[in-house]
Amino acid sequence: YGPNELPAEEGKNAESAIEALKEYEPEMGKEIVPGDLVEISVGDKIPADLRIDQSILTGESVSVIKNILFSGTNVAAGKTQMAETEEIKTPLQQKVGEATETALIVLGEKEFTLEFSRVIVITGDNKKAEIGIAMGSGTAVAK
């Protein structure tokens, strides 16, 4: 046999071993949809951006959402179930988008800029609240 060749029997064994290992492969991010629960444990590669709910650990009846685990990172310790996250626009962001389109139609030959800032604040009861701040400015273009 050459240096890069295996006997037929050993080659078949290696192929079947690789096929068996594929069964342990984690779900790929493209197969996971928002809301799916993903179980991860030590050594697993995070298949998608996930949000942590620690209420099962603390015994609280209401979900306690923590920071995100990012796709491609690895689990160093522990085991948990996490939910897939999705970046969605808030109703205010959707309205700002509609207002921008309307403003561009109405203003026609005028230059219009709309800046939107999203600010996250912590309320008195330790919950997050989003505040949207929109600032617009326009300039008329002389013909």
From Swiss-Prot:
Location, primary (coarse class): endoplasmic reticulum
EC top class named in words: translocase
A Gene Ontology molecular function term of the record: metal ion binding
Source domain of life: Eukaryota
Catalytically driven reaction(s): Ca(2+)(in) + ATP + H2O = Ca(2+)(out) + ADP + phosphate + H(+)
EC number: 7.2.2.10
Keyword terms, alphabetized: Allergen, Calcium, Calcium transport, Endoplasmic reticulum, Ion transport, Membrane, Metal-binding, Sarcoplasmic reticulum, Translocase, Transmembrane, Transport
Pfam hit, one: E1-E2_ATPase
Topology of the protein relative to the lipid bilayer: Multi-pass membrane protein
CC terms in the record's Gene Ontology section: sarcoplasmic reticulum membrane
UniProt-annotated location(s): Endoplasmic reticulum membrane; Sarcoplasmic reticulum membrane
Role this protein plays: This magnesium-dependent enzyme catalyzes the hydrolysis of ATP coupled with the transport of calcium. Transports calcium ions from the cytosol into the sarcoplasmic/endoplasmic reticulum lumen. Contributes to calcium sequestration involved in muscular excitation/contraction.
Family per record: Belongs to the cation transport ATPase (P-type) (TC 3.A.3) family. Type IIA subfamily.
Identification of the protein by name: Sarcoplasmic/endoplasmic reticulum calcium ATPase
Organism, as annotated: Chionoecetes opilio
